[in-house]
A protein has these predicted regions:
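N-terminal secretory signal peptides that target proteins for export/translocation
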Residues: 1-13
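Feature marking well-ordered beta-strand scaffolds used for ligand recognition
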Residues: 2-4, 20-22, 29-31, 40-505
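Sec-dependent signal peptide recognition
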Residues: 15-19
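A residue-level detector for conformationally permissive "hinge/kink" positions
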Residues: 21-24, 413, 465, 485, ...
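Tryptophan-rich substrate-binding surfaces of secreted polymer-degrading and adhesive proteins
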Residues: 501-602
């Protein structure tokens, strides 16, 4: 196992230090493992929400590492009710929170997908949406089962739900109860979703310090489902959450008998106690989130003050193989995303616990950001940071949060939620020079006070971006860009962003192979799609030939003009140093002709 603490060298000048994150996913969503159960927003009442906001402010003031830099004067930011975005990303649908999930304190949380359905967590339970038609999604079920934060995953006929707030029991009729009471319960719940519109509760497993998040890893023989449970912030006053807590919990669910789910191990990840904290870095007392890559027997953990790699070839006994720290800019290691090849990891820093306005010039571009690491010889090698450049208002919580890959062959592109900073699509194919290629943003929920809101999770699923907004419910967005359109051909039956699948790259073009229309291949470092049946015709040899180049961008993140590619009105390209926008359908017409299809952009 390797352990390195490093201070980064950056391309941007340093900014005022904005300190460590709260030991909770959301500062204003205080969980019972860290505070008393009285703060649990189980009913979403104005009184409960106000108490949480006051408590979050007090928590920030009480922690020496939580001294926030003064906010810069917000300029050119959206007003409440306004929206904005890049022309290649369209917001096409929204289903507001409703029923018992409507109150402000009932936060919408994570997402999982299966078939035509999206399963959306909420502090009050979970909702099932039919997203087969992304422009007209429908709510088809709502399950009331309180217990924040209801992190959610699906696998086959099973749905797994996390509870990280102390409850009176493991039923869905529970109420908040202090973690200081031995009989209180936290852990995971298992539901049968063989009928997705009518889930049935079948099992529960109590875990130490509850289950803030969880990740799935099916056994190699396909007979069991292993659940890696992440939790943190032990307290000597809590009988079931005693310090030290340098471990995760592993739950095994027999797929032929899910009611027999049980805790099988509690691997010690930090025998030396992990990051001791200080200098703006969080003290490690467990993990916030683990992302598995089951086909590669690999996982990445975001563990408060540490980022780790794990070998999960023995599913019940994962082993840490690499540890890295960033004591200069990372306050709270929150989540991780691999690239498709498993040769990179994007870690997120949830500075301020998700409840603070950190997207402004005072905080700067390197705190509350993503950090891109290459995996070289099993070691994590820092390459760069990525953070949205749009300034957000002082009443908008904004920091890097949950996202997923967009399966573009030959490129590393992800979509990501930034709370009230909106949604960003960005390319990290060049690890040292990430670039944004699309975005969507709403104005603040209020100009007078910070209401915790924005996109908790934004993921790509079968051609659409689906987001769960903390206050405004389910959003669907459609991305139309020549850089990413190849991803629309990738269809999956199931998707849990924290259990990454492997997307199969197109095969290399072969002169002797016959290709039907729609087939994709790689050739000359690019991805090509056959427009019709072809054999023996080299991609790129003839601009009017059967092959259309569908993936490839320049260093600025805009697609370079290619003669073989089909462009439609609104598409942007670069050509000889100038950016152009198509005025109508075009192919093999080079930009530069004032009477042609391309409009130069100043």
């Amino acid at each position: 196992m390797h352990r390195r603490t490093h201070r980064q060298t950056h391309r941007h000048r340093s900014r005022v230090l904005l300190a460590s994150s709260l030991a909770a996913t959301l500062a204003v969503s205080t969980l019972a493992v860290a505070t008393t159960a009285a703060a649990e927003p189980s009913d979403g009442s104005p009184e409960a929400v106000a108490a949480l906001t006051d408590q979050a402010a007090a928590s920030l003031a009480d922690l020496p590492a939580q001294r926030l830099a003064p906010l810069a004067q917000a300029t050119d930011v959206l007003a409440p009710g306004e929206t904005a975005g890049s022309p290649n990303l369209a917001h096409v649908a929204n289903i507001p929170k409703n029923g018992g999930f409507a109150p402000e304190g009932q936060y919408s949380t994570d997402l999982a997908f299966q078939g035509r359905y999206a399963f959306a967590g909420n502090y009050g339970g979970f909702t099932v949406y039919d997203v087969a038609n992304p422009t007209a999604p429908q709510q088809v079920a709502q399950v009331v089962c309180p217990g924040s934060q209801n992190d959610i995953s699906v696998y086959g006929d099973l749905l797994v739900l996390s509870t990280d707030s102390s409850r009176s029991n493991d039923s869905c009729e529970n109420v908040a109860q202090s973690a200081a009471i031995k009989e209180s319960w936290e852990g995971i719940k298992v539901f049968d979703i063989s009928e997705p519109t009518a889930p049935e509760y079948v099992a529960s497993v109590e875990t130490q310090c509850g289950s803030h998040t969880h990740s799935l890893a099916p056994s190699q023989d396909g007979e069991e489902l292993f659940v890696y449970v992440s939790s943190y912030s032990p307290n000597a006053a809590f009988p079931d959450c005693q310090p030290p807590h340098d471990l995760i919990s592993v739950v095994q669910i027999p797929l032929d008998d899910p009611a027999a789910a049980e805790l099988v191990s509690t691997p010690l990840l930090f025998p030396d106690g992990g990051n001791p904290g200080g200098n703006g870095s969080s003290t490690t007392s467990g993990c916030h989130d683990i992302t598995t890559y089951p086909s590669k027997d690999l996982a990445a953990g975001a563990c408060m003050g540490d980022g780790i790699l794990l070998d999960i070839s023995d599913r019940a006994h994962p082993v840490v193989t690499e540890v890295v720290r960033d004591t200069t800019n990372f306050a709270f290691w929150h989540s991780a995303t691999f690239n498709n090849a498993g040769t990179k990891v994007v870690f997120t820093d949830e500075l301020g616990g998700g409840g603070a306005p950190t997207c402004n010039p005072t905080v700067g571009p390197e705190k509350g950001a993503d950090a891109i690491y290459d995996i070289v010889g099993g070691e994590l090698v820092f390459k760069s940071y990525y953070k949205i450049e749009r300034e957000q208002a002082a009443t908008e919580n904004c920091v890097a949060h949950n996202g997923s890959l967009i399966p573009v062959p030959g490129r590393d592109i992800m979509v990501q939620a930034w709370y009230q900073g909106g949604i960003s699509v960005w390319d990290f194919t060049d690890s040292a020079n990430p670039v944004e290629i699309a975005w969507f943003d709403r104005g603040p929920l209020s100009a007078e006070r910070l209401i915790l809101g924005g996109s908790w999770s934004a993921y790509w699923y079968n051609g659409a971006i689906i987001s769960n907004d903390i206050q405004q419910g389910l959003d669907v967005l459609l991305l139309d860009d020549p850089v990413t359109n190849a991803a629309k051909s990738v269809v999956t039956d199931e998707f849990n962003p924290q259990a990454q699948p492997t997307y199969t790259e197109p095969p290399a073009w072969s002169k002797g192979t016959a290709y039907a229309g729609g087939t994709t291949v790689t050739y000359g470092g690019a991805v090509w799609r056959a427009q019709w049946w072809t054999k023996g015709q080299t991609p790129g040899a003839d601009a009017w030939g059967p092959w259309e180049e569908i993936a490839g961008v320049d260093s600025a993140g805009v697609g370079a003009w290619k003669p073989s590619r089909v462009y439609v009105k609104g598409d942007s390209v670069t050509y000889e140093g100038t950016t152009y926008t198509a005025k109508w359908w075009t192919r093999n017409q080079a930009p530069g002709d004032r009477w042609g299809p391309w409009d130069p952009q100043d």
